């Protein structure tokens, strides 16, 4: 009789288990020098000596912690995308990500962003679906001056990227919404105060995304950690804790810990979850290093047990689940807020604006007496504190800038990532393409728009990373370089259908072996929308129909 040899557990680089040896190149870079230290080199060395002086481990590693990615060299289509061609497609310019952390921006702040864009970024500016503003064509020589101007108005790019707590999602109407359970702004401010520029949290296993909102308006199910407003029958208003969300190539929705957290304890609980991720998170394979993989392997009960016993030293209060929302809360349009004034939400196509536009928005804000505005998680802009007698004036002025507050459903519900215009990871054009796709859909589907009981969301992403949240859209497109049917390859997309959040949370379905070329996007959306209207049952949503429809109907 032979004794079975014990199975050796693979070293996943979990610090809490004593596995401190770096197991991939990024972990080695972080160990060699703390990522936050690169700021001084940017200011004192690279900005003075130019792009060619930048050390590669800083350029492709630590720069991310300063909100900087090199952008794609112009003229290289999706066939060039891949690690083997990084040297060829990497331009000597940067995308700079400016985080907002749910803060309201004054007219002066908005104008400062506009001026930075026009002076240093060739008038580019994109509102991301993480409530950030992204600028392009940034030269390393200009970074210190841009930082100086941003920081003078309370903004920063620090840790807008990297293996660290990214910018925090907060409600665009935090403290203002008539429907919020509570205003969590103090908790967000305290989390940022504790975490930003803190070496204790600057070396997490992977990116770490947080949402804190008194409303379900921040896509909380797709975050690593999220706190959502909920009313406890005994304890009153507080927040419901979710962990383990994230999309990309292994999408997972966050799960409830079934606990109720009072507002003043949110920063402590957030730190405990973050420390747990730092210590127990996987650091061997980058593709398996997000918190969601740990939550999946442990299960939610073990996660809560370790959180309470090892990090909080107390038991959390059991809490009720918030009722899931039926429709996306995007804050587009005009609505009353708590102070009796109005919020006006507008919809640029897929978040694309410009420095010139932002400066003009600042002028309009001052003209109508508003001094607060926020980005949204759906690539929109909301202007707050607008008096009743100034709403029409503001709406007219914003319309003239291409920022409608009464947009078509297609404009309102289309999102896109950066795409091949600037992103080295992309296989397809996305944001630029939406600028013509949305008007095309408005024209082609005008005859059936009134038949849509609820709008159909369309999300375009240039690669599998799902920055534009394609798996939770009614119609999601994932960029690929595809066979054109004649032996050649062209830019195209894999189709995802029937995803959603809230009451219909799920990832929908992927059509097997069905790809759509970029030129066919309008045709495809037109075709599948009309088939839905022909084949739906009474009151049936697009997502529900898409999940049950024959695959042939969806092609």
UniProtKB/Swiss-Prot annotation:
Cross-link for 3'-(S-cysteinyl)-tyrosine (Tyr-Cys), residue positions: 69-161
Subunit comment: Monomer.
Keywords in alphabetical order: 4Fe-4S, Heme, Iron, Iron-sulfur, Metal-binding, Oxidoreductase, Thioether bond
Lineage: Bacteria, Bacillati, Actinomycetota, Actinomycetes, Mycobacteriales
Cofactor binding, per record: Binds 1 siroheme per subunit.
General function of this protein: Catalyzes the reduction of sulfite to sulfide, a step in the biosynthesis of sulfur-containing amino acids and cofactors.
Residue positions binding siroheme: 467
MF annotations from Gene Ontology: 4 iron, 4 sulfur cluster binding; heme binding; metal ion binding; sulfite reductase (ferredoxin) activity
Residue positions binding [4Fe-4S] cluster: 417, 423, 463, 467
Gene3D superfamilies from the UniProt entry: 3.90.480.20, Sulfite Reductase Hemoprotein, domain 1
Family of the protein in this entry: Belongs to the nitrite and sulfite reductase 4Fe-4S domain family.
Reaction(s) catalysed (UniProt annotation): hydrogen sulfide + 6 oxidized [2Fe-2S]-[ferredoxin] + 3 H2O = sulfite + 6 reduced [2Fe-2S]-[ferredoxin] + 7 H(+)
Protein name: Sulfite reductase [ferredoxin] 1
Cofactors (names): siroheme; [4Fe-4S] cluster
Assigned EC number: 1.8.7.1
